[in-house]
């Protein structure tokens, strides 16, 4: 009986997705509070700053598989802990 119970527990653990899922902020505002659960393959939070037509800097936040390269007139910050892209 104990063996059967142990087997069921092991099978349950293997079948469940017990992997860690990262959360990142996804809104463009300065005081961003909107949290998004990233897909399993997205392990990076990104915050991009870019110059919006000489009207000042804007931020774009989200999840990514890898840290993107910065484009001209853009700064990219990457991190890998929950909600680290504030």
UniProtKB/Swiss-Prot annotation:
GO terms for molecular function: acetylcholine receptor inhibitor activity; ion channel regulator activity; toxin activity. It is found in: Secreted. It holds the Pfam family Toxin_cobra-type. Expressed by the venom gland. Its main location: secreted. PROSITE patterns: SNAKE_TOXIN (PS00272). Disulfide bonds join 24-45, 27-32, 38-63, 67-78, 79-84. Residues 1-23 form the signal peptide. GO terms for cellular component: extracellular region. The keyword Repeat does not apply. Transmembrane segments: none annotated. Keywords: Acetylcholine receptor inhibiting toxin, Disulfide bond, Ion channel impairing toxin, Neurotoxin, Postsynaptic neurotoxin, Secreted, Signal, Toxin. InterPro entries: Snake_3FTx, Snake_toxin-like_sf, Snake_toxin_con_site, Toxin_cobra-type. Belongs to the three-finger toxin family. Ancestral subfamily. Orphan group II sub-subfamily. Binds with low affinity to muscular (alpha-1-beta-1-delta-epsilon/CHRNA1-CHRNB1-CHRND-CHRNE) and very low affinity to neuronal (alpha-7/CHRNA7) nicotinic acetylcholine receptor (nAChR). This is Weak toxin 3. It comes from Bungarus candidus. The lineage of its organism: Eukaryota, Metazoa, Chordata, Craniata, Vertebrata.
């Amino acid at each position: 009986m104990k063996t059967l119970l142990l087997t069921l527990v092991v099978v349950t653990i293997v079948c469940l997705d017990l992997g860690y899922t990262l959360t990142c902020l996804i809104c463009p505002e300065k005081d961003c509070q909107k949290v998004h659960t990233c897909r399993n393959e997205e392990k990076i939070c990104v915050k991009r700053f870019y110059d919006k037509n000489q009207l000042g800097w804007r931020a774009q936040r989200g999840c990514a598989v890898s840290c993107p390269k910065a484009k001209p007139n853009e700064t990219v910050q990457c991190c890998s802990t929950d909600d680290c892209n504030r």
